[in-house]
Amino acid sequence: MRTSSESHSRSDAFNGKNDASQVTVDSDSASKDHHDHDHHHKDTSINERQSQHVHQQAGVSKVEAFNKALYQSGPSGRLLLYVLVASLALTMFAYALDQGITYQFNAIASSDFSQHASLGAVNTASSIIRAISKPFLGKLSDITSRPTTYVVVLVVYAVGFAVAASSQGLAAYIVGASFTAFGKSGLDLLSDIIVGDLTPLEWRAFWSGMLATPFLITTFINGFISDAFVPNNWRWGLGMFAIMMPVLLTPAIWTLYGMQLKAAKMGMVSMGDSGLARKDGVKVQGMQQYLPMARSIAVEMDLIGLLLLGLAFSLILLALNLAPASNGGWSNPSMIAMLVIGFVILGLFIAYEALLAPVPITPKRILTNKAFLCALTVDVFNQMASATRNNYWSSYIYIIKPWSNYVWTIFIGTTTLTLCTMSPIGGLIHRATHRYKTLMVIGAIIKLIGYGVGLDGNSRSTLSTARLAVSQVMLGMGAWTVIGARVGSQASVPHQDLSVVISVMSLWSTMASSIGSTIAATIWQDRMLNYMREECPPSTPEATLKKIYGSIKTLKTKYDWEDPVRMGAIRAYTRTNGIILAVSLVLAAVPVVFSCLMPNYYLGKQQNAVTNTDVLGERTEVPRRVEEPTNGKPSLWQRVKRGYYKET
C-alpha cells in the first residue's frame, strides 16, 4: 500500500495544494492516536449516512468473491479475464465502426429521400430510443443474464440495419435507425457495467477510456467505407453492418456464458449472470419462474414511467422537427395536437413519478446525491451542446470543402480521434494524481473555447480549415470532462447502485442529445432556405433552391465548386451553422460551472468512495486531505479553495 505522503506527492502538484495541508490515513487495521480516531469516526459516519438506505446484497458479495477467485485461481482465471478483455475489444470495435460512419449515412440517406432538412428527426428518434432502452435492458438482464441480453441486442441490431438498408422512405429508415439505436444502447450499458465491476476508482477512467480506443483504427477504416459507399451505395454499407455485427459480437457472448459456467461450478456468481443472481443471489430457472417475475420486473424498471417519458419526448421533439416542413407549418392541427398532448403526458409523467411510481426511474437516494446531480448536469449539457453542433456538422463540412469522401470522413472523425486519445491519457492522470476534478474542469474550459474557435467574428461559422481543425481537436479534449463526470458519479454510490447510476446518467444525457438534435433541426429548418434565397443569385429558381435545400448530394455533385449557386449555398450554410454553434457555446458554459461543484474524491484502490471497499469487497486504506485551522476568519480565497477541494 502506498503511504499517504507518496499518494499525495503527485496529486498535490496537479491540484495545486499548498504546504499548509497535511494528510492522514484511515485504516481499520492500523493503530491510531486519539486525533486520528476522531477523524476516522467522522468519515465512517459520513459513509453510513450516504448509504443508510442501501445494504450489501447477497449477490454483490458473491460477485466480489468470484472476482477474487478469478484473480487468484491461477492461469485459468487469468486466461478467462484476458479472453473477456479481448472479446470486449471486438465488441467495441463493432460499436466504433457503427458510430464512425452512420452519421454520414444518415445525412446521405435523408438526402436520397430529398428530406435532408428532416435529418434531425432521424437523430431525435434514435436518441429517444437509446435513452429509454437503457433501463429496460438493465432489467432484462435481471431476469435473463448479460450474455442473453447481448443476444437480444445483437438480433435487434442486425434487423435494424437490414430495415434501414432496404427502406424506401424516410419513415422506414427512421424505424431501422431506431432498432440500431437499441443495439448501441445495449453495448454502452453492458460494457460500462463490466468495467465498473472489475476496476478500482484509480483505474476506472483509464479502462473506460480504453473502450473507445478502437475508434483510433476504425476512423481510418470508415474513410475507406465512406469512399466506397457514399453517396450512391449507402444501402450496401448498412447491409454490410448487418453481417459484420454478429461476427464481432459473438465472442463476447460466448465468453460471458463461459464465465457463468465457471461460476456455477465454483458455486459463485459471475458478472455475466443475471442481475437477480448478482444482486440477491437468486438463480432463475424455468418458465414457471420467469413469468411470475415479469410483473415485478416491470414495476422495478418503472415501465409505465419509461413509456410516459418516451411518448412525451417523442411527441414534443418530433413535432418541433416536423412542423416546419409540414403543410401549413405550425398552423397544421396535427403538429399542435402532438405538442399539446406531449406536454400533457410529460406532466402526467412528473406526477406519476412523484406520487404513484412504486420504483421511480431515479430513486430518491440518487436524487439527493450532490455528486450525481452535478455530474448529471455536466453530462446533460455536454451532450446537448454536442448534439446541437453535430446534427448538421458532417453536412456542413461536406458542402463547404471540395474534399473527397475519404478526407471528409477522416476530418469528421478528428474529434473522435482526439477523444479516444485523451480518454486513456486522462485515465492515467487520474491514476497518477488520484484526483479527477481539476482535469474535469480543464476539459470543460477547453471544450468551451473549442466551440468559440469555430465561430467567425461576424457570427458565421468559419471556413478556415486550420480553425475548423483546432476546434475539432479542442472539442475532443472535452473527453476529460466526460470521464470525470463518469468516475465522480460512480464513486458517489455503493457497488449495488452502480448499474442504477449508469442507467440513469445514460437515460437523461441521451434525452439531452435528442433535445440538442431538435434545437439544431429547428434552427436549420427556420433559417437555411431563407438564407439560400438571400445568398444565391437572384435569378435562381425557387424549385432549384428547394432541391439543394433538401439534398446535400445534389448540391455537392450537380454544382461545381465555382458555381454561383454553390457559393451562395455555402454562405447560407455558414450563417445557419453560426447560429447553431453559438447555441452550443452557451450550452457548453454550464458544465464549466458544475464541474467546479463536484466533490474532489480520492481515487484509490476502492471500488467506490462510499463504502471504501475494493473490487473484492475488502476494506481499503483511503488517504484524505485535512486542512489546518486558520487563525481568525478565513479569507474569501481560502473559503473558495476549501470548497473546491472538499472531498464530500
Swiss-Prot record:
The chain crosses the membrane at residues 79-99, 151-171, 205-225, 236-256, 303-323, 336-356, 409-429, 438-458, 468-488, 500-520, 578-598. GO terms for cellular component: plasma membrane. It is a multi-pass membrane protein. It is found in: Cell membrane. SUPFAM superfamilies: MFS general substrate transporter. GO terms for molecular function: transmembrane transporter activity. InterPro entries: MFS_trans_sf. Residues 1-11, 29-46 have a biased composition (Basic and acidic residues). Keywords: Cell membrane, Membrane, Transmembrane, Transmembrane helix. Residues 47-58 have a biased composition (Polar residues). Siderophore transporter; part of the gene cluster 14 that mediates the biosynthesis of a ferrichrome A-like siderophors which may contribute to organismal virulence. This is Siderophore transporter MYCGRDRAFT_70577. The lineage of its organism: Eukaryota, Fungi, Dikarya, Ascomycota, Pezizomycotina.
